[in-house]
From Swiss-Prot:
Residues 111-140 are annotated as: Disordered. This is Small ribosomal subunit protein bS6. Keywords: Ribonucleoprotein, Ribosomal protein, RNA-binding, rRNA-binding. Residues 121-140 have a biased composition (Acidic residues). It comes from the Bacteria. GO terms for cellular component: cytoplasm; ribonucleoprotein complex; ribosome. The gene is rpsF.
Amino acid sequence: MAKVNTYETLFILDSNHYARDPGGVAKQLEELIAENGGEVQVSRMWMEQKLAYPIDKHQKGTYYLIYFSMEGPNLTQLARAFALAEPVIRELTIKLDPRLVEPILANARGEHFTGPAGAEGSDDESTESTDEAVAETADA
């Protein structure tokens, strides 16, 4: 069994298509991930913006983010499915660093990531040493 990784995909979607049926477009993308063996962690619309240059005669695009987990070998098949999906103008998928998955997902959910236990003390120590360095510089 291959290792399960967490990925982030940023889509540029057809704004007209998304405006007509935002829930349907989101469901379609999430179903593509599920059909290819993935599990959606977080999905949300990011923004709508005029494109820097026309892409397939589209002047404006809706940026949509999806974070999901799946086995690596299935990614090629999923990329093909994304390319064939009607509302998708462009997409970019990246593999997330395992050390950053929790903070990124917490941020995407709108939550505050507190970090692993004991990490707070290290922040206090670094702040104190920074304060000491500033004080020493001011004295010089």
